[in-house]
């Protein structure tokens, strides 16, 4: 089992070290946990994928309206080309995580378990302007080996729908039931082995696992059903609107919120609204409450 929290500059070297230690201990198959991994350095993900691929297999390609297709293939030097692999994903897994899981799935090299990934797959270039500022221009998209576009749908000018996609997926029950996942029959693709996979943004898992509901307690149900959770999210946004509006990407916002004392602040707020503090139940539901607040 290897948990990859972020694709940083040194992630690949750490990954190789972990693989070597596991093999030395007798490990012959691997579970790669990408849950909560928002991406990072693309080269790190590609190098990791290469460890599991036979020579000549397509890993990923990029293509844009004015940007010619560019393919990346496995070079055959990987140390785990025949090792069984399982990849764990969730709705936060994004970007490089999706390239990794998409390549494994489309090449039939392993099984993807969890929930549909975020759907972030844009190629951007940075342009320096005369006033010293810089602009990031989207020039292409990332595609999995079968031809699936990783980037989720975006309608020009409709930023609200794009920004609220995760929340809408939650409200539609997609995190709790496989039946709530909408499969677009017009976006069917085939893996190397002939299995059908679906496009439409993000990577659909081979095996669906609903979100963990072990954190649902009477305290959690109370703050949700009373509307206090949503009310706090609105008031928090109003109090920190300037700061929250300063982030350029959702990853920056997510990382910022991860460092804030949201739970303790919320519990104090809920108490002013008549929700009694229940330390034991709060401890059980804490992570779930934090996730909900961040989603709002």
Give each language-model segment a name.
Residues 1, 56, 134-136, 186, ...:
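A residue-level signal for beta-strand positions that form part of recognition/binding surfaces
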Residues 13-18, 44-48, 66, 73, ...:
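General "foldedness" signal
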Residues 23, 36-37, 73-75, 111, ...:
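Generic detector of intrinsically disordered, low-complexity, polar/charged segments
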Residues 149-150, 154-296:
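Conserved functional hotspot residues or short segments at active or partner-binding sites
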């Amino acid at each position: 089992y290897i948990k990859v929290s972020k694709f940083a500059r040194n992630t690949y070297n750490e990954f190789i070290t972990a693989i070597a230690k596991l093999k030395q201990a007798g490990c012959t198959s691997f579970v790669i946990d990408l849950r909560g991994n928002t991406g990072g350095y693309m080269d790190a993900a590609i190098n990791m994928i290469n460890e599991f691929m036979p020579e000549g297999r397509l890993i990923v390609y990029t293509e844009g309206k004015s940007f010619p297709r560019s393919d990346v293939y496995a070079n055959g030097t990987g140390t785990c080309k025949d090792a069984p692999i399982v990849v764990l994903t969730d709705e936060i897994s994004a970007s490089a995580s999706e390239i990794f899981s998409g390549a494994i799935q489309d090449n039939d090299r392993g099984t993807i378990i969890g929930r549909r990934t975020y759907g972030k797959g844009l190629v951007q270039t940075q342009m320096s302007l005369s006033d010293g500022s810089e602009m990031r221009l989207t020039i292409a998209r990332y595609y999995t080996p079968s031809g699936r576009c990783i980037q989720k749908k975006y309608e020009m000018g409709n930023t609200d729908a794009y920004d609220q996609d995760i929340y809408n997926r939650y409200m539609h029950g997609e995190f709790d039931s496989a039946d709530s996942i909408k499969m677009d029959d017009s976006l069917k693709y085939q893996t190397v082995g002939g299995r059908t996979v679906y496009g439409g943004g993000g990577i659909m898992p081979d095996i669906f696992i609903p979100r963990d509901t072990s954190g649902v307690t009477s305290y959690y149900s109370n703050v949700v059903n009373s509307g206090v959770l949503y009310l706090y999210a609105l008031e928090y946004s109003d109090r920190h609107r300037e700061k929250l509006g300063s982030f350029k990407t959702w990853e920056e916002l997510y990382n910022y919120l991860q460092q804030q004392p949201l739970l303790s602040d919320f519990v104090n707020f809920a108490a002013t609204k008549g929700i009694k503090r229940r330390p034991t139940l709060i401890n059980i539901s804490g992570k779930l409450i934090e996730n909900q607040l961040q989603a709002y």
